């Protein structure tokens, strides 16, 4: 858990510099042990799509594959 959070924190510091990233942070789940949530806000869908396939994200997936035991991605649009 600690190794994962440390690696994720480093990854997030890079994401914060990406075009279109308005907010990203890590939250510890208070009801489920060893579970974290990452909350991201992107300026638009194309920016998020570009983030998901850039070299930094590919490198993260290589690191995370040995540390993550489940992942759910939910994409939401803000209501007017």
What are these regions (language model features)?
Residues 1-4:
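Short, surface-exposed ligand-recognition loops at beta-strand->loop->(often short) alpha-helix junctions
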Residues 23-26, 38:
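A structural signal for the hydrophobic beta-strands that form the central parallel beta-sheet
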Residues 76-80:
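Short hydrophobic/aromatic patches at helix-to-coil boundaries
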Residues 34-36:
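Residues on conserved beta-strands of the protein kinase catalytic domain
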Residues 27-31:
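Short beta-strand micro-motifs enriched in acidic
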Residues 10, 14-22, 41-75:
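An amphipathic, aromatic/His-enriched active-site/gating alpha helix that lines ligand/cofactor pockets
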């Amino acid at each position: 858990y600690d190794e994962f959070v440390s690696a994720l924190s480093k990854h997030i510091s890079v994401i914060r510099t990406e075009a279109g990233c308005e907010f990203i942070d890590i939250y510890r789940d208070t009801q489920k042990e060893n579970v974290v949530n990452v909350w991201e806000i992107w300026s638009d869908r194309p920016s998020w799509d570009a983030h998901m396939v850039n070299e930094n994200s590919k490198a993260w997936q290589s690191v995370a594959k040995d540390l993550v035991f489940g992942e759910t991605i939910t994409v939401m649009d803000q209501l007017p």
